[in-house]
Amino acid sequence: METSSSGITNGRTRVFHPVAKDVNILFDELEAVNSPCKDDDSLLHPGNLTSTSDDASRLEAGGETVPEKNKLNGLYFRDGKCRIDYILVYRKSNPQMEKREVFERNIRAEGLQMEKESSLINSDIIFVKLHAPWEVLGRYAEQMNVRMPFRRKIYYLPRRYKFMSRIDKQISRFRRWLPKKPMRLDKETLPDLEENDCYTAPFSQQRIHHFIIHNKDTFFNNATRSRIVHHILQRIKYEEGKNKIGLNRLLTNGSYEAAFPLHEGSYRSKNSIRTHGAVNHRHLLYECWASWGVWYKYQPLDLVRRYFGEKIGLYFAWLGWYTGMLFPAAFIGLFVFLYGVITLDHCQVSKEVCQATDIIMCPVCDKYCPFMRLSDSCVYAKVTHLFDNGATVFFAVFMAVWATVFLEFWKRRRAVIAYDWDLIDWEEEEEEIRPQFEAKYSKKERMNPISGKPEPYQAFADKCSRLIVSASGIFFMICVVIAAVFGIVIYRVVTVSTFAAFKWALIRNNSQVATTGTAVCINFCIIMLLNVLYEKVALLLTNLEQPRTESEWENSFTLKMFLFQFVNLNSSTFYIAFFLGRFTGHPGAYLRLINRWRLEECHPSGCLIDLCMQMGIIMVLKQTWNNFMELGYPLIQNWWTRRKVRQEHGPERKISFPQWEKDYNLQPMNAYGLFDEYLEMILQFGFTTIFVAAFPLAPLLALLNNIIEIRLDAYKFVTQWRRPLASRAKDIGIWYGILEGIGILSVITNAFVIAITSDFIPRLVYAYKYGPCAGQGEAGQKCMVGYVNASLSVFRISDFENRSEPESDGSEFSGTPLKYCRYRDYRDPPHSLVPYGYTLQFWHVLAARLAFIIVFEHLVFCIKHLISYLIPDLPKDLRDRMRREKYLIQEMMYEAELERLQKERKERKKNGKAHHNEWP
């Protein structure tokens, strides 16, 4: 193979490059060497770096040594040289002292350094500071296959790019006169927030000279150091026995009270970041990500990943992608709503309702509800048109396609992120068995087919029996939800009569709206109360199943909680959409609950207004409550902790707490990790897609909420929570499958909402079959003349049941008692051969509804599958970059190995120990 005979020296490292076989290389060899990748402190302002090698001369000249400075910031040991990588917290009064002593003795045996400090607030609390020296980091980084940078990436660019680059240079001259992109972070006044692209490889101590190491203290960033220390702690014994191992078990049995990595100092600074730079990465994250002043800017995902790890970085990447994709959905939804506003004055149906002063409607409840003119519901007819108009069907199809496009392009976006963050070839380590599983099944063992070691085993019969009990518990809780919905239904049918007899005319005349509004608020309270119960039941059932590993436990718990909360949140919405007013009977023969309460009817303008109110109120209240609990609850708890400290030590005494004590007083991350954050967004995604045909403004509300949600979550992670352990993940896990399921369900529900809940199909049938334009192939507004009258049936008042007969005889309308009233249905008049039987128009409408559901579902599903087929999971340029990177890495590894062998041969010749080798 043809190789380069000369190398380029950069500092301590002599780098050899393979000969490029194509001249179209973006970065030449000299640039590749002179522009090395950045270390952990390179994102900060040069004047604020805390590295000992960088700051020694500057600080000593000012009379202050580096160790003295490091002692003050609370991030180092007492000597000011060893950085704190992990904190353990326990109480001296805890009886598990023997286990801690064995555990800490083994920690020192692994090479970790340790110091202990008492709390300034409570002397019973002890902080154990842990530091991993370079030798320990290198040894375990090699075991964990931690990928580290060793060469700047070299991109292949086609010849066409040369011509395009010249054009871009000309365009860039004019761009200087244009305003800068407001959504991008200002990289001129702030430090560069993105890493330079570097080739990475699993760290190897034998090939350490090939990695880009400017400073051993910052080669492994703080998140990686903490992850390595946590990995060590999970494999240290605290007692004799094969299962007495790991920090998690000590946290479970109370030996340690807390364990966490440190934040990198304060998130605030007296000086502006634009003039003095960032004090630390936490400060940089706060200013560029968690501050409300940057709510409109893109997220610095690379910095989030460096500080919190890939798992949390992927969550914010997904949340940002979801929020960005909501922009077109919100715009189209707003357009549908505005289209209804613009066409409101031209809507023939609304005109006929508002002008129908001579049409008297039958009472909507027993006795107390009066007769009413159809024109009294003019406002509701206009509001219904805002959401149920000609653009609704288009919007439903658009949202179904949007959900597919969102998921397909997220797969592509995830692939790019996985490539940039070195997650393509990453595989999770073999998971440890849960301590609860080991304790339960320690007497039964079998050989693990992967590790070849004996492990506890759960019999198939035992597993099936537990799953059956768990499924029964899930079914019972779903029945509880249905019972709660049934209670809301009874409330609605009972309250509508009460409001109809109310003294206040405003409530009496709007009894149905008042009933719906109060029922929705009560339903929201029930939802929030049941959510607390569901969490405890889901936890109980998941522990009953005895999952083997933490990921199995997490997946099982996630499915249960999602199922419970989804049913809890949407059950009343499903009732209003598909059951309200569908099975009420007709005047003179009403259907009743337990032969007592008459089922609730829809408003004369239809049931869609009830569905809109349900979705709007629930969505606004739930998002407001979630945002308050996410930020307000930690703020209140942290304020209460500070208040207790001031009361114990006096408000006039100012205590300077070290960083470990400040972090200990913050709230720990949720016990379920990112579960609550994902669940909130997934339920919102369901609300945005499942009933979007009835509420086109749902995407807009979701967009506004998510813009706030991103900054709330960022603020919470940076300022209110302890720093979570930096974990790795390749994707969003089981949530992607749930999103796909919601996308499929949304197609079905929107088809039924359009066909059954809205009046789209009845209007269509009337226009083409019964209206003035019947048989002419037209369906404009002029073809809807007479639709309202055709959609109402006639009832003879003397046919009322005794318990349904209203107290009023309707003489207030014409001066004489009414003989007939109208109601929404397609039935024959009382004097026909079959009184109150279904008309032919009813069967035509029913057939059209069923046909629409079938056609809509098949059409949309075909479009979804076509889009999924046409959009590849990996972008073509990314696929080419991956293949080229693999090729170049092989070449560079070959060069490195060849260099090592040649060096060894020269040394053997020099020492006079040369012997024959066939290669090289």
UniProtKB/Swiss-Prot annotation:
The keyword Transmembrane applies. Residues 38-64 are annotated as: Disordered. Glycans are attached at residues 509, 789, 802. It is a multi-pass membrane protein. Coiled coil: none annotated. The chain crosses the membrane at residues 324-344, 390-410, 471-491, 513-533, 561-581, 681-701, 734-754, 851-871. Residues 345-389, 492-512, 582-680, 755-850 are extracellular. It is found in: Cell membrane. GO terms for biological process: chloride transmembrane transport; lipid transport. One of its GO terms (cellular component) is plasma membrane. One of its GO terms (molecular function) is intracellularly calcium-gated chloride channel activity. Keywords: Cell membrane, Glycoprotein, Lipid transport, Membrane, Transmembrane, Transmembrane helix, Transport. Residues 1-323, 411-470, 534-560, 702-733, 872-920 are cytoplasmic. InterPro entries: Anoct_dimer, Anoctamin, Anoctamin_TM. It catalyses: a 1,2-diacyl-sn-glycero-3-phospho-L-serine(in) = a 1,2-diacyl-sn-glycero-3-phospho-L-serine(out); a beta-D-galactosyl-(1<->1')-N-acylsphing-4-enine(out) = a beta-D-galactosyl-(1<->1')-N-acylsphing-4-enine(in); a 1,2-diacyl-sn-glycero-3-phosphocholine(in) = a 1,2-diacyl-sn-glycero-3-phosphocholine(out). Belongs to the anoctamin family. The term 'anoctamin' was coined because these channels are anion selective and have eight (OCT) transmembrane segments. There is some dissatisfaction in the field with the Ano nomenclature because it is not certain that all the members of this family are anion channels or have the 8-transmembrane topology. Has calcium-dependent phospholipid scramblase activity; scrambles phosphatidylserine, phosphatidylcholine and galactosylceramide. Does not exhibit calcium-activated chloride channel (CaCC) activity. This is Anoctamin-4. It comes from Bos taurus. The lineage of its organism: Eukaryota, Metazoa, Chordata, Craniata, Vertebrata.
